[in-house]
């Protein structure tokens, strides 16, 4: 079964496992496993938006998101690292700062990067060392 999920229009890293205990451990919010995404946006990324997202943001409906880490890649593209996994989290966060996500791809879980040799829909087994990397902090 999948350890975590992606929205229907998000691509990238999905971990499938038969180890329920491991899946629970990496999915549990108390363990704060980092997940990194490449985000393409409709509009340029504003400094104020980066600051708000990096400090944590609360939506009008009261939903609070923990601080995220953002690395600017270009005017309309960034990497964002979050440790939660709330419903449509990244899309909702960027909407709250006046922008819209046009493409979203998960590239990393914990310290393990998505294997760039894999095309969408392909999979491979991970090694024991890679498995450990998922639950390790940077």
Model-based region annotation:
Residues 1-138:
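Basic, flexible Lys/Arg- and Gly-enriched helix-loop patches that mediate nucleic-acid binding at interfaces
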């Amino acid at each position: 079964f999948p350890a975590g999920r992606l929205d229907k229009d998000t691509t990238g890293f999905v971990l499938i496992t038969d180890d329920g205990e491991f899946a629970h451990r990496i999915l549990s919010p108390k363990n704060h496993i980092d997940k990194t995404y490449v985000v393409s946006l409709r509009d340029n990324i504003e400094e104020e938006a980066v600051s708000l997202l990096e400090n944590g943001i609360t939506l009008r409906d009261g939903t609070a998101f923990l601080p995220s880490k953002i690395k600017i890649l270009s005017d309309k593209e960034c990497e964002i690292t979050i440790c939660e996994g709330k419903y449509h989290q990244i899309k909702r966060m960027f909407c709250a700062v006046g922008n819209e996500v046009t493409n979203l791809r998960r590239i990393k879980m914990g310290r393990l990067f998505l294997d760039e040799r894999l095309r969408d829909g392909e999979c491979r087994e991970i090694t024991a060392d890679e498995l450990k990397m998922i639950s390790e902090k940077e």
